[in-house]
Amino acid sequence: MQVELIIKNLNVYNSYFKKFIKGDILINKGKFLHIGKGYEDRLWSENVIDGEGKYIIPGLIDIHMHIESSMTIPREFSKAAIKHGVTTVVADPHEIANVFGIRGIEEFIKFKGNLDIFYGIPSSVPSTSSSLETTGEKITHNEVKRLLEYDNIICLGEVMNFKDLIEDDDSNINKIINISKEKNIPLEGHCPKIQGVDLSLYIYRGVNGDHTQQSVGSLQEKIQNGMFIEMQHKSMTLENIKFLIENNLYEHFALVTDDVMADKLVKGHLDEILKEAVKLGMSIENAIYASTYTPARRMNLLDRGTIAPGKLADFILLDSIEDFNIYEVYKNGEMVFNRDKGLKEEFFEDKSKLDYRFYNSIELNNITKESLEVKVPNKYKNKVNCRTMKVLKNTTFTEEGEVTLNVYNNILQWEKSSCALIAVFERYGKNNNISFGLVEGEIIKEGAIATTWAHDHHNLMVMGRNISDMTIAANEVINSRGGYVVSKNNEVIAKLELPIGGIISDEPIEIIGEKLGEVRSAMRDLGYNHMNEIMSFSTLSLPVSPALKITDKGLIDVKKGSIVSLFK
């Protein structure tokens, strides 16, 4: 029997024994046909390659990520990710859903990349409720029914609305979960700092996966209660990895990326998380297992994730396993990336364009300096105690603080304080909301930052040390149809345009990455000190991430799930 491809003399990763075994691989019709030896008198090919002792592993599978986090479209994401050995992803498009609703999800699904992109249904759009944040659209149980008909929808995306989930049987999120259960798909969670009975109630509803930041304690409690853990970068600590190794928990977690910024994507993706696990003490064999086999099983992708007869021939050839140096990447038995030759461009032939309406979504006039004046109620005379959001250096969580500020003519005098002012402007043309907050910590010491890439509602958010720079930065974002802008001394010093929904661009990923790198550098130059400046700032607006956040409706006490006043 003739087969399409034979690669000889390889060290083949075997998922079942978690070790490398010397042998050959035979591929036919995009799938592995035979692994090993003893085939010569029965199977042959006109296309035989000498593997020269290279290491072959399954293509990497990332089961929790957001393409919009890379600020790009599926085609450009595919081209970038496949260079890093990623051949399958499960994307939760809840960012585009918050802006455009089901129309955005369906457009994203049609707007193909050429690695396998499966999707989770955004379950929490908005992330909380319309009483706490304004979004462009909503996803209800009716839209979920429609989306479940798509073949490449394979799970329910992260369930963030914890309060409604456990307190209201008739809530939209419980209706969504009940519909999803009928399809027997995985239900993905988002449950940071939820524990005890609250965690049990959360799991009882059927949500049994979590990707949020973990500690040893949360890992133990969640896994022993049946949760599958998705380990992203901020959970990759020495203590966490040691706990997983010592307790032999390899069947209960996978490595994922969640959010990879464009400037980071050009350098690495899931391969970087894998290498980080190895640096922290995990064997390369087990790190590969957690990046291929367990994620495939979690998402019922039983046709991939291992090198075995009948499985998809998605694989990576490595020069060595010590440095995880990728030589080639194959998709469905076809070489799509070579380290020396680059991408096989014809593999990425999709040239479709988004509808023009996706490029004009900012319904907001230019703001004025007067609109940034914080008016104080008459009952406060010369001074007022204010809540603050304290930015923490190594997490996207905040702490609530307090500061006493002067009041003059009912206007808050904040510019000479230790705090920056933050404001959120509703951008969908629905209610013209404006809210204010105060931010402290190792943030900018001068200038301003503005963005519509503000999780998850993606309204216009601006933070600064003076009203003039805040106005300039915010208006530059509006005039760019969305984006990220940094200003200083009344000038724009860095800018990334994101005209699609105010959150993504269709420029090549290298250009997006370069511009985002300039924004990141400018934020650092202004004094922002954080492990990920972009995510730190952009999640100040995320009302499901502890402890005090801001939306267009006001300051949100995340634990209570309620609006609290800036003034105490």
From Swiss-Prot:
Signal peptide: none annotated. It holds the Pfam family Amidohydro_1. GO terms for molecular function: adenine deaminase activity. It catalyses: adenine + H2O + H(+) = hypoxanthine + NH4(+). The keyword Magnesium does not apply. It comes from the Bacteria. The keyword Hydrolase applies. CDD domains: AdeC. Coiled coil: none annotated. Keywords: Hydrolase, Manganese. It is an enzyme of class 3 (hydrolase). Gene3D superfamilies: Metal-dependent hydrolases, Urease, subunit C, domain 1. Its EC number is 3.5.4.2. Its cofactor is Mn(2+). One of its GO terms (biological process) is adenine catabolic process. Belongs to the metallo-dependent hydrolases superfamily. Adenine deaminase family. This is Adenine deaminase. The gene is ade.
